[in-house]
Amino acid sequence: MKTQNTPFKQIAKLGLLLLLTVAIVACAAYIPKPNTSMSWKEEVLLHDGSKIISHRFYNLYGGYDTQQGAVIDETVTFNLPNGKRIVWKSNYSDSVAEPNGLSHFYFDIINGVPYLATYPAGCIAYNKWDRPNPPQVLFKYMDNQWQRITLAELPSELINAQANVIVGNPDRSLLKPYYDVTAVNTKNAPISTPEYKTILGEPVKGGGGVTSCEVIVRYKCGWGGPGEFNRKYFERVCK
């Protein structure tokens, strides 16, 4: 005896296929994306017209093929005119309490001393660095290490200097192995927030940069606004 393929059974089969399709798509969405990396070299124009080459390497969390992924950390190697190499490293993890999350935008050498200008990459980093204004963190390289300096300690000829490295990291789908000075400037041209491309000599008033970030503090397992409510909340959820 033949079994009739009734409309009800057809609908049931279609429903089952739909559920299986949704389940497969949902499972695929939860497959962890592999960590990736990206690197390139760029030409850095110094204040005196000379040039050096830096090599930049980023570890990224997630992102298939050309997808960007979130930055885990970066390592920048500067090849100095005297043949020496110095390295700048920055970690972007919000889960650690230590100050981190700095993006560099300017490098130069004055009287043989390397200087680096950076900005906090996001509100958590800005609060980790005690909310500086101008919202930038400055360094010089002394005794084989990067040492934080104040704006007053920065050579005056570097005030108002414009970014001479690629700010942030290029889109992976458009990444090139090498960027000369012209290409670096082209990449930075669309940036309109002054503190991301200019060494500022005065505090920022208003604007859409990190100075507009609310005050947040570190709790046991996260960040939040100061106050009794958040303190009790994090005490409850932080196990």
Report each predicted region and the residues it spans.
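Phenylalanine-focused residue identity feature
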Residues: F8, F57, F78, F105-F107, ...
